[in-house]
């Protein structure tokens, strides 16, 4: 069956002259209306000052003894990749060591490089001081102009230079990760048949250093009409394992445990996400799942020892059960805890889960509820510390250093206040829709406001 003619298909050529001209024409119409408004100039100046302010939180990712950050500003348009220590990061003005200057690299190579991330080989279990030299290499990804396809190159952070003769992938929609210092799991374009019809990797290869990529062992091949295939290694000390994922569509996948030359399929719903936490298999459901005489609801988070699951047992511990007012927003993992970010009537709550011999304990973390909370582990394999980002209607974004097992946390960074919030207050209220459904909402107002029904109110949602 032939597809119907799409008269607007030319707009999909995002860099095409016709598409860019069309965008310029539409932008001109919008800009003319915006710029004609009296409030435009002062508002534009104010927003530009906020966006370009140096008072931004430099979020970091830890590797070995250093905390890395990618930073852009008016002096570094493409950006610099830099690092510092925790002691320095605690200071108002940390001392940063530049690891890579992307503006200089783009200029020297004549390329329109856009940063697409760094991937380190995780530290082994021994002390950082002894292990750092073994994990000073990382895989850097760059795109040309910000596209989906990237170039991957091995980089030495100690020498601050690309590794001569190191791992390198030409521009493609690639998926790559470490097995060990000399071995990668790679999905990329190696010629005809290596990519799916969607343009993503169809094959996963195990690539040894110093060998041709096209000769690398094929670990898995997806179907041509699948979305993609990928693989990764779990580096949790004592629970190292490898998984292969067959992505059937954006919201459906199959997961396989790699055991030597064998791929053992994880018997989960295609719509569910699954990952391991030490020896536990954790499954997040996107649809109801009936198994062994019990139905688990959409949105539930389940756990069971992986070894027991592979033996056919299905008596899951329910780590989270949704309700009409309660949903799971995010999951983060530290060395010994799972941190769930829950939404209860659209208010945030962080719940800390710890497991011992298959039994899970639950503790609600004391954190602000009427705002946005974001949790990111500092070192998911080696530490119970985590970063907690907090902001609400009246509080500028603040970054804390917390630790599983305690509510004590250290304020690391905070943005400056852009208005005086001392006279304001925030509360959560509930209204009822016509069918009786409760609708939670937040109310921001002056502390001295009289609730007599006569106050002008700005409603949005």
Task: Say what each PLM segment does.
Residues 75-82, 147-153, 193-206, 241, ...:
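Structural motif
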Residues 181-257:
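Solenoidal tandem-repeat scaffolds enriched in leucines and small polar residues
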Residues 53-70, 109-141, 168-185, 222-245, ...:
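Conserved beta-propeller blade repeats
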Residues 83-86, 151, 156-163, 169-192:
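Hydrophobic or amphipathic alpha-helical targeting/insertion segments
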Residues 3, 9-14, 32-54, 88-114, ...:
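Multi-bladed beta-propeller domains
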Residues 42, 46-86:
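Long amphipathic N-terminal alpha/beta scaffold segment
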